């Protein structure tokens, strides 16, 4: 149910967007090695062994692109808020661990999950991101004060002790084949010690929430979400073709009711497609990325080409250089808005990653009645 004069309201990934948070690149750091992070950085990556503050030049460039993105959204009458960056280049600790620095606040989608009138802070699964919610607290506090129906929730903070991670999971050169075997068996770097999830592993389809089980979200995390969202149906999915299964939004992207693009290298398994096929949803292979490799010092894969931001069921923001993805979405009947963001990818992801919904028009609907 949508409340009158609500500040916070968003039930899915495609209803008309009216209010959004866009991240900032200020002070972003490359985090030092830690158990979950080691498993995400490919052995041949130029990020191996590098950590510390990113250069002022790259930060300024990324911030300029994010500011330009904000201007484009505002010209379309979308209200934009920005996080308040804390000092990321400082040591942090809990009774269980110490970390050399934090990460940043470019990708709010990783941290904040908006479902209806509720904004939920995810547990997070990297130690360097444990305090990342603090960047968004000033905004959430403001929404809470202005909107009497808004709910601010925070999932139980995990300890992230060594028990949360498989020791030496990918510390040696194991090879891609072994990694793929492990992910197919759902054998990931994170254990089932306690509930873990990143908000970017969750896609909202009205009454149904689709959650990726992988490196950053475990089964206990999915169970916690199921208990928390009692009025929703929570479905766990996995993508066996992904050797680094982290965050669903460069793998499986809903565009509008009835249409999803799926990474052709990470196909949804046949048995998990039933929910979509039974309800007349079309899953099409996403277009190939325009690039053969990610930008320098970037965690993400070339498939950020799929990391698009849907503004309404007829309009989508696509990264400017991703011409094949833009062409495909154009042929699928969407108006495509090109956004230059590639030089900000390294700070936390693409157009979907760098945003978090505050308000979309529309109410809670059931898009999968047959199940």
Region spans (language model):
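The feature marks the mature, well-folded catalytic cores of soluble enzymes
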Residues: 1-371
